[in-house]
UniProtKB/Swiss-Prot annotation:
Keyword presence, Transport: yes
Chain segments annotated as coiled-coil in the UniProt record: none
Family, as annotated: Belongs to the bile acid:sodium symporter (BASS) (TC 2.A.28) family.
Cross-referenced InterPro entries: Na+/solute_symporter_sf (IPR038770), Put_Na-Bile_cotransptr (IPR016833)
Pfam families according to UniProt: SBF_like (PF13593)
Name the record gives this protein: Putative symporter YfeH
Alphabetical keyword list: Symport, Transport
Entry GO terms, CC: plasma membrane
Length: 332
């Protein structure tokens, strides 16, 4: 019973989706169906966020340079330093490609949709999350290949205009259209916040099912033994824990408020599976891609589950803080 109190309904749903993808992955004609459905859900998510946020909130979020600077440092400085130290240390005797895979993971940009969705679920600064996560993803398309070439001796990597266009089309365009639609649908969105929250959660579940289905179809459970798999899980948990603790410490050290702390935690601790796998296809030989992205695929699932728990905890804290503020205002 204690486990069920720790794992809230959404986290349990996440685990169920992972198990569903493990036993019943999307195959054949269902693959493009779920890919298109996921794309549509993400576009709807950003459309609704655009409609929900006021012009003042967006301007304030975009101008929050201290927050954006730290998120970029967490993504492109803290993570790579940890990856280099870990690959140099090699504490366990496993396939060297797994160490290279973790190093590659640490170089990647932040994931966008889940970072923003979790920020929204937790009551964080969504406007800043949209700006910070989108900027990280766009910058990573050019910066990550350069870092790969620098620390992994892989050359010939460059930014993809197609990837930039995809981010603009799937994320920023729906957000802008939603915001432009705010005069007509803004009141409806404000009255249906619970439905908007369901959109956040549904988009995350679809991303998890689609990503894990692809991993299962590609033989994720046959590529490594149980010992190596346990190694990946433990290292992923330790790496994620270090980054989250550092982000929380720095957010409080730099005197960010609770909403900004939430944004920093969720935007500064994520790594993008959506960018990482296509980029690996360009940067590495086909024969090693599976092993290179295996740590990323497992880390991706762990970060979603851990952040689901954190989002619920932050949400309770945010609701308690709001209740205290409202109570103080009534007494005044």
């Amino acid at each position: 019973m204690k486990l069920f109190r720790i794992l809230d309904p959404f986290t349990l749903t996440l685990i169920t989706v992972v198990l569903l993808a493990s036993f019943f992955p999307a195959r054949g004609d269902f693959v493009p169906f779920f890919e298109n459905l996921t794309t549509a859900a993400i576009a709807l998510l950003f459309f609704m966020h655009g409609a929900k946020l006021s012009r003042e909130a967006i301007i304030a979020g975009g101008g929050h340079w201290r927050l954006h600077l730290w998120v970029m440092c967490s993504t492109f400085v803290l993570f790579p330093i940890l990856g280099v130290l870990f690959a140099w240390w090699k504490p366990v005797n496993v396939d060297p490609m797994l160490y290279s895979g973790f190093l590659y993971l640490c170089i990647l940009p932040a994931t966008v949709q889940s970072a923003i969705a979790f920020t929204s679920m937790a009551g964080g600064n969504v406007a800043a999350a949209v700006c910070s996560a989108s900027a990280s993803s766009l910058l990573g398309i050019f910066l990550s290949p350069l870092l790969v070439g620098l620390v992994m001796n892989v050359h010939g990597a460059g930014g993809s205009l197609e990837q930039v266009g995809k981010i603009m089309l799937q994320l920023l365009l729906p957000f802008v259209l939603g915001h432009l639609s705010r005069p007509w649908i803004g009141d409806w969105v404000s009255r249906n916040k619970k439905w908007i929250a369901k959109t956040d959660q549904t988009s995350i579940l679809l991303v998890v099912y689609t990503a894990f289905s692809e991993a299962v179809v590609n033989g994720i459970w046959h590529k490594v033994g149980w010992g190596s798999l346990l190694f990946i899980v433990v290292v992923s948990c330790v790496l994620l824990a270090i980054v989250i603790v550092v982000n929380v410490f720095m957010a409080r050290r730099l005197s960010f408020n609770k909403a900004d702390e939430i944004t920093i935690v969720f935007c500064g601790s994520k790594k993008s599976l959506a960018n990482g796998i296509p980029m690996a296809n360009i940067l590495f030989p086909t024969s090693v891609i599976g092993m290179m992205v295996l740590p990323l695929m497992i880390f991706h699932q762990i970060q979603l589950m851990v952040c689901a728990v954190l989002a619920r905890r932050y949400k309770r804290q945010t609701e308690q803080l709001q209740a205290q503020q409202e109570s103080s205002a009534d007494k005044a």
